[in-house]
Amino acid sequence: MDRYGEKQQQQQMFASYVDASLLAASGEVQGERPRARRRRRRGARCVGGGGGGGEVDGGDPKKRRLSDEQVEMLELSFREERKLETGRKVHLASELGLDPKQVAVWFQNRRARHKSKLLEEEFSKLKHAHDAAILHKCHLENEVLRLKERLVVAEEEVRRLRSAAGSHTASGEGGDIMGLGGSGACVAGSPSSSFSTGTCQPPSFGGGDHLGDDDLVYVPEYGGYADNSVVEWFSLYGLI
């Protein structure tokens, strides 16, 4: 019985120890949770106050939104100087009632906007020049096509004129040869050679052709004889 009682007592002590440890752990956890909630609530209150812009932004006049006069003064200063020195920045901030850091940030943003504007203007100029170059290229290509067409037409006209000139020359030479053969012209070995019966053909007279008295030629005589050359010519053509 004593041993049984000791075991029960030990079990009770262990159970009480476990219960105490569990209660302590739960108490610590429960104690931390409200603190975390309170911190979150405080942060929410701070965020809410800053979001409204009434207390946080309104409390510090240097962090308020810039007025039109302040912006105009900053723009004038930016036109004079793109980047302010430290003394100039502090002096301008004191004149406008702003924080020097706020003035420095404004100038930094203004330089970035100015650079972006310059890049946009440069891009616009380059794009305009590129479009003009493409248009000029199209005009040149059209002009090249027109010149090629004119060249083809000119080459065809040259070929036509050459062929026409060649055919005209060939026909002219053939006509000259035929005219010489049918006209009965005399062909001599040299310009000073006399007439010969072998190379000259007398003109033919048809049956209707008749020589009258008026067609006869009187040949004067010299020393009882006529001119031998004239007589020879008339006798050649059967006139005497």
Curated annotation (Swiss-Prot):
<feature type="DNA-binding region" description="Homeobox">
    <location>
        <begin position="59"/>
        <end position="118"/>
    </location>
</feature>
<keyword id="KW-0539">Nucleus</keyword>
<keyword id="KW-0238">DNA-binding</keyword>
<dbReference type="InterPro" id="IPR009057">
    <property type="entry name" value="Homeodomain-like_sf"/>
</dbReference>
<keyword id="KW-0371">Homeobox</keyword>
<feature type="region of interest" description="Disordered">
    <location>
        <begin position="26"/>
        <end position="64"/>
    </location>
</feature>
<dbReference type="GO" id="GO:0045893">
    <property type="term" value="P:positive regulation of DNA-templated transcription"/>
</dbReference>
<feature type="compositionally biased region" description="Basic residues">
    <location>
        <begin position="35"/>
        <end position="44"/>
    </location>
</feature>
<dbReference type="GO" id="GO:0043565">
    <property type="term" value="F:sequence-specific DNA binding"/>
</dbReference>
<comment type="function">
    <text>Probable transcription factor.</text>
</comment>
<dbReference type="GO" id="GO:0005634">
    <property type="term" value="C:nucleus"/>
</dbReference>
<keyword id="KW-0805">Transcription regulation</keyword>
<feature type="coiled-coil region">
    <location>
        <begin position="108"/>
        <end position="167"/>
    </location>
</feature>
<comment type="similarity">
    <text>Belongs to the HD-ZIP homeobox family. Class I subfamily.</text>
</comment>
<dbReference type="Pfam" id="PF00046">
    <property type="entry name" value="Homeodomain"/>
</dbReference>
<dbReference type="InterPro" id="IPR000047">
    <property type="entry name" value="HTH_motif"/>
</dbReference>
<feature type="compositionally biased region" description="Gly residues">
    <location>
        <begin position="46"/>
        <end position="56"/>
    </location>
</feature>
<keyword id="KW-0804">Transcription</keyword>
<dbReference type="InterPro" id="IPR001356">
    <property type="entry name" value="HD"/>
</dbReference>
<protein>
    <recommendedName>
        <fullName>Homeobox-leucine zipper protein HOX14</fullName>
    </recommendedName>
</protein>
<dbReference type="GO" id="GO:0000981">
    <property type="term" value="F:DNA-binding transcription factor activity, RNA polymerase II-specific"/>
</dbReference>
<dbReference type="InterPro" id="IPR045224">
    <property type="entry name" value="HDZip_class_I_plant"/>
</dbReference>
<dbReference type="InterPro" id="IPR017970">
    <property type="entry name" value="Homeobox_CS"/>
</dbReference>
<keyword id="KW-0175">Coiled coil</keyword>
